[in-house]
């Protein structure tokens, strides 16, 4: 029950952060929207650790100025979250996160710089975090599919992960 409460608080926080106010927003960019992680690898000088299968639900939501992400362990016992401001320069393939809050306090205040590109509905980025490079692949969540699921038009195999 406690995990469900934490996940609900996380989802509400992410939704509030991702909601748009017309006067406060910059022009749209291709990163705006909801993304679901499909792959995460930690690339060390002598090895690669694939963490893709270690997590349950794992989403990142971006509006024109801010991002928020949240994920939980497969068993639902642990929820991690973070967010802050971001910069995106598609002409230079650069994505920068300015982390303002994080479930790991040591990450709060950090700035992470990534080489990034979007191809169709897939977002690739890689950047240095500590002593490794973080390589992630995200798929855009189709809002129409989510709306259909909420209306009951389709059946999901996992109600926590709409896509």
Task: Report the location of each language-model feature.
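Bacterial N-terminal signal peptides that target proteins for export
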Residues: 1-9
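Bacterial N-terminal signal peptides
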Residues: 8-18
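Lipid interaction determinants
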Residues: 19-81, 94-163
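Extracellular/luminal ectodomains and secreted, surface-exposed scaffolds of diverse proteins
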Residues: 84-88
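Short, charged helix-to-loop "capping" segments that act as catalytic/coupling loops
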Residues: 89-93
